[in-house]
């Protein structure tokens, strides 16, 4: 019998804002957000819990945030500091395991299956890690502990902020059976509405459904939906895997048929893509991101992708890609549009310089 895995998902609490409050204690207890200025048509990168009481959230336009919360204290992004603190957190992780998969600066998966510290208890290990982060860095973290990767991520939100939640092998089956499908990664508003129309609300409902029907109705995602609902998640924690690209996509409430409609969606996706890039690559120019791609998924669930190396990241370049890939629709409706960009590397930069 295979060894039951022990997975921890660590998620820092309002990370950037928490660092700013640590650096300037006068901010504690006040609504604080990290983000761009109104003049620069900026958006919030994150905000603390005091600000969230006013309905503020990440990616909200700064101008809108200030209308909701006139006393909001806006702090500019300090990416070098956030990256330095993130590395300090990862040094704490590595005291317990080398199998660490970062998802962003403020969250990561840890595989502690073979860790012998804390008598091998993943629960105690997570608590020790969170204690160390607080004692050494004066920041709080939340954690989810489970035998499966997707479950660990889901339950890390369960006792936020500054808490943790455990799914043991013994209670995993019952927990998954009652788990709302909207909690599963990848189930957005549109997919959740479609599931609800079919009378599917929990993983238990999927368990009682026909496998072929789920696969046919939801395409490739149907396989993940079926497996997660049956407590199957064999994805490994990929240690030291550098992320090579970033993607954003939108499953549409209703299929579209016209290029003009698609261009409006690309506009919104481009803003979201730039926001996420600036969150993790704030010190890099958008012109350094040269390899772009666009994806269309059609009403029949087939999909196509077009990738190009360009002179840099811009809305105009994505619109050009959209106009080219739209020729492949062949009178089919479009149900999803996605944009992606490859991260620049030193090797790629040197190669490109030869042609500048």
Curated annotation (Swiss-Prot):
<keyword id="KW-0235">DNA replication</keyword>
<comment type="similarity">
    <text>Belongs to the DNA polymerase type-Y family.</text>
</comment>
<comment type="subunit">
    <text>Monomer.</text>
</comment>
<keyword id="KW-0515">Mutator protein</keyword>
<keyword id="KW-0479">Metal-binding</keyword>
<keyword id="KW-0548">Nucleotidyltransferase</keyword>
<keyword id="KW-0963">Cytoplasm</keyword>
<dbReference type="InterPro" id="IPR053848">
    <property type="entry name" value="IMS_HHH_1"/>
</dbReference>
<keyword id="KW-0239">DNA-directed DNA polymerase</keyword>
<dbReference type="InterPro" id="IPR017961">
    <property type="entry name" value="DNA_pol_Y-fam_little_finger"/>
</dbReference>
<dbReference type="GO" id="GO:0005829">
    <property type="term" value="C:cytosol"/>
</dbReference>
<keyword id="KW-0238">DNA-binding</keyword>
<keyword id="KW-0234">DNA repair</keyword>
<feature type="binding site">
    <location>
        <position position="106"/>
    </location>
    <ligand>
        <name>Mg(2+)</name>
    </ligand>
</feature>
<dbReference type="GO" id="GO:0000287">
    <property type="term" value="F:magnesium ion binding"/>
</dbReference>
<dbReference type="GO" id="GO:0006261">
    <property type="term" value="P:DNA-templated DNA replication"/>
</dbReference>
<dbReference type="InterPro" id="IPR043128">
    <property type="entry name" value="Rev_trsase/Diguanyl_cyclase"/>
</dbReference>
<keyword id="KW-0460">Magnesium</keyword>
<dbReference type="InterPro" id="IPR001126">
    <property type="entry name" value="UmuC"/>
</dbReference>
<dbReference type="Pfam" id="PF21999">
    <property type="entry name" value="IMS_HHH_1"/>
</dbReference>
<dbReference type="InterPro" id="IPR022880">
    <property type="entry name" value="DNApol_IV"/>
</dbReference>
<dbReference type="Pfam" id="PF00817">
    <property type="entry name" value="IMS"/>
</dbReference>
<dbReference type="GO" id="GO:0003887">
    <property type="term" value="F:DNA-directed DNA polymerase activity"/>
</dbReference>
<feature type="site" description="Substrate discrimination">
    <location>
        <position position="16"/>
    </location>
</feature>
<feature type="binding site">
    <location>
        <position position="11"/>
    </location>
    <ligand>
        <name>Mg(2+)</name>
    </ligand>
</feature>
<dbReference type="InterPro" id="IPR036775">
    <property type="entry name" value="DNA_pol_Y-fam_lit_finger_sf"/>
</dbReference>
<dbReference type="GO" id="GO:0042276">
    <property type="term" value="P:error-prone translesion synthesis"/>
</dbReference>
<protein>
    <recommendedName>
        <fullName>DNA polymerase IV</fullName>
        <ecNumber>2.7.7.7</ecNumber>
    </recommendedName>
</protein>
<keyword id="KW-0227">DNA damage</keyword>
<feature type="domain" description="UmuC">
    <location>
        <begin position="7"/>
        <end position="188"/>
    </location>
</feature>
<feature type="active site">
    <location>
        <position position="107"/>
    </location>
</feature>
<dbReference type="GO" id="GO:0003684">
    <property type="term" value="F:damaged DNA binding"/>
</dbReference>
<keyword id="KW-0808">Transferase</keyword>
<dbReference type="InterPro" id="IPR050116">
    <property type="entry name" value="DNA_polymerase-Y"/>
</dbReference>
<comment type="function">
    <text>Poorly processive, error-prone DNA polymerase involved in untargeted mutagenesis. Copies undamaged DNA at stalled replication forks, which arise in vivo from mismatched or misaligned primer ends. These misaligned primers can be extended by PolIV. Exhibits no 3'-5' exonuclease (proofreading) activity. May be involved in translesional synthesis, in conjunction with the beta clamp from PolIII.</text>
</comment>
<dbReference type="InterPro" id="IPR043502">
    <property type="entry name" value="DNA/RNA_pol_sf"/>
</dbReference>
<dbReference type="Pfam" id="PF11799">
    <property type="entry name" value="IMS_C"/>
</dbReference>
<dbReference type="GO" id="GO:0009432">
    <property type="term" value="P:SOS response"/>
</dbReference>
């Amino acid at each position: 019998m295979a060894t039951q895995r022990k997975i921890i998902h660590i998620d820092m609490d309002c990370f950037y804002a928490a660092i700013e409050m640590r650096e300037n204690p006068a901010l504690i207890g006040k609504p604080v957000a990290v983000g761009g200025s109104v003049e620069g048509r900026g958006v919030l990168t994150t905000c603390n819990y005091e600000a969230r009481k006013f309905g503020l959230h990440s990616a909200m336009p700064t101008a809108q945030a200030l209308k909701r919360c006139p006393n909001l204290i806006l702090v500019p992004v300090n990416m070098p500091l956030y990256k330095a603190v993130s590395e300090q957190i990862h040094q704490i992780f590595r005291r317990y395991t080398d199998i660490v998969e970062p998802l962003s600066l403020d969250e990561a998966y840890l595989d502690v299956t073979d860790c012998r510290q804390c008598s091998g208890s993943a629960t105690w290990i997570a608590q020790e890690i969170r204690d160390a982060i607080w004692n050494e860095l004066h920041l709080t973290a939340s954690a989810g502990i489970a035998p499966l990767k997707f479950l660990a991520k889901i339950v890390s939100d369960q006792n936020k902020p500054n808490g943790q939640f455990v799914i043991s092998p013994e209670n995993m089956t019952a927990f998954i059976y009652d788990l709302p499908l909207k909690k599963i990664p990848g189930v957005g508003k549109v997919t959740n509405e479609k599931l609800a129309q079919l009378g599917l609300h929990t993983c238990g409902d999927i368990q009682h459904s026909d496998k072929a029907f789920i696969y046919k109705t939801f395409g490739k995602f149907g396989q993940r939906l079926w497996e997660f609902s049956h407590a199957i998640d064999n994805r490994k924690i990929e240690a030291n895997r550098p992320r090579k690209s970033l993607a954003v996509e939108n499953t549409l409430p209703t299929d579209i048929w016209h290029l003009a409609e698609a261009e409006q969606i690309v506009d919104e996706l481009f803003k979201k893509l730039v926001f996420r890039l600036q969150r993790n690559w704030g010190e890099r120019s958008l012109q350094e991101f040269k390899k772009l791609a666009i994806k269309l998924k059609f009403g029949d669930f087939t999909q196509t992708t077009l990738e190009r190396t360009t002179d840099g990241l811009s809305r105009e370049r994505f619109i050009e890609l959209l106009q080219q890939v739209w020729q492949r629709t062949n009178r089919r409706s479009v149900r999803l549009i996605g944009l992606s960009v490859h991260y620049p590397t030193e090797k790629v930069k040197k190669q490109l310089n030869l042609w500048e």
